[in-house]
Design a protein with these regions (language model features):
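Amphipathic, small/basic residue-rich leader segments at the start of a protein or domain
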Residues: 1-95, 109-121, 125, 134
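Short beta-turn/strand-loop junction motif enriched in small, turn-promoting residues
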Residues: 64-66, 87, 131-135, 151, ...
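Conserved protein kinase catalytic domain
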Residues: 79, 100-103, 116, 172, ...
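FAD-binding core of FAD-dependent oxidoreductases
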Residues: 90-100, 123-129, 158-171, 190
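Glycine-rich, mobile lid/loop segments that gate access to catalytic sites or pores
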Residues: 110-111, 147-154
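A gly/ser-rich beta-alpha-beta helix-loop segment of oxidoreductase catalytic cores
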Residues: 107, 125-147
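Short, well-ordered, mixed-charge alpha-helical segments that flank or form enzyme active sites
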Residues: 99, 111-113, 134-139, 162-164, ...
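A short core secondary-structure module
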Residues: 143, 152, 156-195
Length: 195
């Protein structure tokens, strides 16, 4: 209950500033009606910074990577309190929920040092490049290919519905890298960090 009270008190204090800054409409669950506007993006980055500075971004991330190491119960409490207060999220949903955990699990130490702090702080915003014209969200049928070329990969294919793409600094890209016919489809893909 100490965590709930801490978060509740912080939200009570900071939601008033948020309402003054964005207006009543934005206080009811988001930055306002035009979420793609420059004004809405500035507001979202401002709010993300407040959450980050208070230690409420990436709360489930391990402490060694800048998170709180929150328990499942603390994550539930966080979500409940954010919803009760009609508090908007920050800019980092795909970075915090997808790119960051993947980098923690499979990335090099250099990648962890380079990307994780910037994901948490909101300095780098991430999008996903998964869906394709002929596959939609059926990821096993994606056709984009990545072929190794020295130290790099040459990517060839199409992506659609790039969630967050117009405001992103980085993308998580799913591309086929294994072409042997006997390999199951879901094992033919690699996960790329693309700028």
């Amino acid at each position: 209950e100490a965590f709930r009270q801490e978060l509740h008190d912080w939200l009570d204090k900071n939601m008033e500033e948020m309402r003054q800054r964005r207006g009543r409409q934005g206080a009811q669950g988001g930055p306002g009606p035009d979420m793609d506007s420059d004004e809405a993006q500035q507001f979202t980055r401002w709010w993300h910074k407040k959450l980050h500075d208070a230690g409420y971004v990436g709360i489930a991330w391990p402490k060694e990577y800048g998170g709180r190491g929150a328990t499942i119960m603390e994550q539930l409490i966080f979500n409940e309190e954010m919803a009760k207060h009609h508090a908007p999220g920050g800019v980092g949903g795909l970075g915090i929920g997808w790119a960051g955990p993947t980098i923690m699990a499979a990335g090099s130490e250099e990648q962890k040092k380079r990307f994780l702090p910037r994901i948490l702080s909101g300095e780098d915003v991430w999008c996903q490049a998964f869906s394709e014209p002929e596959a939609g969200s059926d990821l096993a049928n994606c056709r984009t290919k990545a072929v190794e070329d020295g130290d790099d990969y040459v990517v060839n294919g199409q992506k659609v519905w790039t969630t967050g793409g117009m405001r992103a600094d980085w993308a998580i890209l799913l591309a086929k890298t294994e072409f042997a016919p006997d390999v199951p489809k879901h094992r033919t893909f690699s996960y790329f960090l693309m700028d």
